[in-house]
């Protein structure tokens, strides 16, 4: 157990995959998973941590299959952006039910549904202790929600991007296929590139590297893992400029 009662981070950008919300359902949003995640985020807020949140849309829409069938990539990406807004609405509602103040911002204008993204307003809301959910990716096609997470993380001057996954961190091989795969506890950005480890897409990863934004990959399905990460305890994989 950590002897340090204070959080290791002041402001974080938490990236959740859309698939994380579907639980064992295989599609859509599992209400029990949504509620558990809202409670874990509430814990961070109660610790005094400022939380920005980016959620993917893969549980509601997957464009790859339709793209193969001939759908225009731009159209598919716009549909994916709307899927992230739907997930954001669900998360905002779950946080409100958990008595956590939250604001949903969209990179594309959706008047009457949620606020349009504003950097100054986002900073103001974070300082006021509200969770800010950033939806619709970057607002541009061809950019992933991982890119959106790194971009928003840099913009709000987050201390770290916390990438929540279904495995315990970054491994030398796929741990689902190889149970003997080795977990890395710490990596430099260059090591990730040299070893061709799958952390996030290259555009997102190099954006984080170029702006010296650390990334911590951890298992959101592991009870208490998010809190341990926040408290600076060894959990998951930390990717940063080693030596800093």
UniProtKB/Swiss-Prot annotation:
Superkingdom of the source species: Bacteria
Binding site for UMP: 57, 77, 138-145
Summary of activators and inhibitors of this protein: Allosterically activated by GTP. Inhibited by UTP.
Residues holding ATP: 15-18, 58, 62, 165, 171, 174
Region Involved in allosteric activation by GTP, residue ranges: 23-28
SUPFAM superfamilies named among the record's database cross-references: Carbamate kinase-like
Subcellular location(s) per record: Cytoplasm
Entry's transmembrane regions: none
InterPro entries the UniProt entry points to: AceGlu_kinase-like_sf, Asp/Glu/Uridylate_kinase, Uridylate_kinase, Uridylate_kinase_bac
Chief localization: cytoplasm
A single GO BP: 'de novo' CTP biosynthetic process
GO cellular component: cytosol
E.C. number(s) listed in UniProt: 2.7.4.22
Catalytic activity, as annotated: UMP + ATP = UDP + ADP
Function as written in the Swiss-Prot or TrEMBL entry: Catalyzes the reversible phosphorylation of UMP to UDP.
PANTHER family: URIDYLATE KINASE, URIDYLATE KINASE PUMPKIN, CHLOROPLASTIC
HAMAP family (UniProt xref): PyrH_B
Quaternary context: Homohexamer.
Protein name (database record): Uridylate kinase
Protein species of origin: Aeromonas salmonicida (strain A449)
């Amino acid at each position: 157990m950590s002897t340090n009662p204070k959080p290791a981070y002041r402001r974080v950008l938490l990236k959740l995959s859309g698939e994380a919300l579907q639980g064992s359902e295989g599609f859509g949003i599992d209400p029990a998973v949504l509620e558990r995640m809202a409670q874990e985020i509430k814990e961070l807020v109660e610790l005094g941590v400022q939380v920005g949140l980016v959620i993917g849309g893969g549980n509601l829409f997957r464009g790859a299959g339709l793209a193969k069938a001939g759908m225009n990539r731009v159209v598919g990406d716009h549909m994916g952006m709307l899927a992230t807004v739907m997930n954001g609405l669900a998360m905002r509602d779950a946080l409100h039910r958990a008595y956590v103040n939250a604001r949903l911002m969209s990179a594309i204008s959706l008047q009457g549904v949620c606020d349009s993204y504003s950097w100054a307003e986002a900073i103001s809301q974070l300082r006021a202790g509200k969770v800010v959910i950033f939806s619709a990716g970057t607002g541009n096609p061809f950019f992933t929600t991982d890119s959106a997470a790194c971009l928003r993380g840099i913009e709000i001057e987050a201390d770290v991007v916390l990438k929540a996954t279904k495995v315990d961190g970054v491994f030398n091989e796929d741990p689902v296929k190889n149970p003997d795969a080795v977990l890395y506890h710490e990596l430099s950005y260059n090591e990730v590139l040299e070893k061709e480890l799958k952390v996030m897409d290259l555009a997102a990863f190099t954006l984080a590297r170029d702006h010296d934004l650390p990334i911590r990959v951890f298992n959101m399905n592991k009870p208490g893992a998010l809190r341990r990460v926040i408290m600076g305890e060894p959990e998951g994989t930390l990717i940063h400029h080693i030596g800093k």
